[in-house]
Each structure stands twice: as C-alpha cells, then as structure tokens.
Regions:
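Formylglycine-dependent sulfatase
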Residues: 1-268
Length: 268
C-alpha cells in the first residue's frame, strides 16, 4: 500500500496483508485519473477494501467511484492474488476460471496444477512444501501464472493503443509456492546457489526483530541446507520465466507503436 499511496505504513494504516486501506487514502490512480490516464491492474495487489468505512460514508463498493476505491484506485483488468491450498476460493480468480476452461480438473486448479507437482504414483505434491520445490509444476508452461498474466497484459496493451494509460503489471511470482514448470524447473540446481553468508553473532546478538524472524518457521526452513537447495533453484527459475515473459510485453509495445512512448518502472 505504500507503493500505491506514496506514504509510510504508519501513515496509511494498512500494516499487514488483509489490513484494509482506509477509505480516503489517495492512491496512484487518484492522481492520474484527473489527467486522463487510465490506471489499470493486471495481477496481484493484496489490497483489502475498507468496507466498513465505505458503508459509513454511503459508498457502493460495486460500482462507479466505489469500485475504484475498493480496488486501491485501479480499474481491474485481471486480479490474481493466489488461492489458499485447501479448496477453491469463495470468489474464484479469473485465472482459476481460465484453468478450468482449459480442462484442468479439480475445485482448485491454481493449487492442484499450477502450484503442485506430480508424484511417481500420480499423487499431488503441493508446492507449498519446500521439499517439493525441486519438482516441476504439473501445468503446461504456457498456462502457468506468469505467462497467463503476461497474455492478459498484452491484451490490454493491444486493445488500448490510442489511450493514455498506466498498467500495473504485478506478477505474483516469484512467491510462495516456489514451484515452476519445465523448462525452468531444470534450469538451475544446487550448484548455482550461492553459499549463505552467516555469522554466529547474528544469532547470539540478534536484535529482538531479527530474533523473532529466526523463530519463524520459514526462517528455520531456509536455515536447512537441503531445503535451500530445493527452493532457491526454483526461485531462480521463476525469475528467469519473468525475464522471458517481459520480452513478450516489450514486443507487444513495439508492435503496437507504443515502445517509444512508454515509461517502464520496475518495483519489487
């Protein structure tokens, strides 16, 4: 939310995932819209609307300006924040519906295909488990999250060649679950992972914040060399996939005559 508002967390109040952004906070879209610039979302935000505040002010979150306020000032082209692993979301994402339409079976193809591998006996091996991260995702590469999001972004770019626009292309990867389809699953191995730089003082003299981080399960997992050697090569493959997909975006901008007029800003 700090990217979208230009304000510190303590100022805008959205301190963690799923904490609503207060209604009334000015976002990128609020500044660009009066200039005639469409501000469009394709991908992930983790934004949670301040429905209580909107109700208090009589703002309908489903239409007009209320729909923009409920989506952090963005016009939603395609939003994908991922799905919990134990079943379909109450409101399935466009991506999950796309996978179902492509013939991927199950109530939650986001998890069962895009973010899981397949065991020797055909069982689903969840990508949420680091011990499975070295395995290739079950899904065809072209149907995985990063190419899908890229294709949706290209649809917007090619359909809006005459408009002034700001496209927030927000890839959900590389992010948990750390799993990627072939050919990226095999591109990197343990030999490509730089050794960690560690000091015993980091543990014995850790600040309260660092000590709390050390106590987290994820930190304990990544302290184990065997798990690092499975997760980090997959993470590197996910980054390489984004590199390749950005090439498709650049080609679309060039083919539609918008390359010289487009400012590309990377954030992470």
């Amino acid at each position: 939310m700090s990217f979208y508002t230009g304000r510190y967390v303590r100022s805008h109040g959205s301190t963690w995932n799923s904490f609503p952004l207060r209604v009334g906070e000015m976002t990128l879209g609020d500044h660009l819209r009066p200039l005639g610039v469409r501000t469009v979302l394709c991908g992930k935000t983790h934004m949670r609307a301040d429905l209580e505040g909107m109700e208090r002010l009589g703002i309908d979150p489903t239409g007009g300006i209320g729909a923009l306020v409920a989506e952090c000032g963005f016009e939603v082209w395609d939003r994908n924040d991922g799905v919990v692993p134990d079943g379909a979301a109450k409101n399935p994402s466009q991506y999950n519906r796309h996978l179902s339409a492509q013939g991927y079976e199950g109530a939650n193809p986001w998890h069962d295909w895009a973010n899981s591998a397949e065991g020797e006996s055909g069982e689903i091996k969840s990508g949420w488990l680091i011990e499975n991260n070295h395995l290739p995702a079950r899904i065809a590469e072209e149907d995985s999250e990063t190419p899908y999001t890229t294709s949706r972004a290209i649809e917007f770019i090619t359909q809006n060649t005459q408009d002034s626009w700001c496209l927030h292309l927000s890839y959900i990867k590389p992010h948990w679950p750390y799993i990627v389809p072939e050919p990226y699953a095999s591109m990197y191995g343990p030999e490509d992972v730089p050794p960690p730089i560690r000091s015993e003082d980091e543990r014995s003299k850790a600040s309260p914040i660092l000590a709390a981080h050390h106590a987290k399960r994820s930190a304990q997992f990544f302290a184990r060399e065997k798990l690092r050697e499975k997760a980090i090569p997959a993470y590197m493959g996910l980054i390489k996939q984004i590199d390749d997909q950005l090439g498709r975006v650049y080609d679309a901008l060039k083919e539609t005559g918008q390359w010289e007029d487009t400012l590309i800003v990377f954030t992470s």
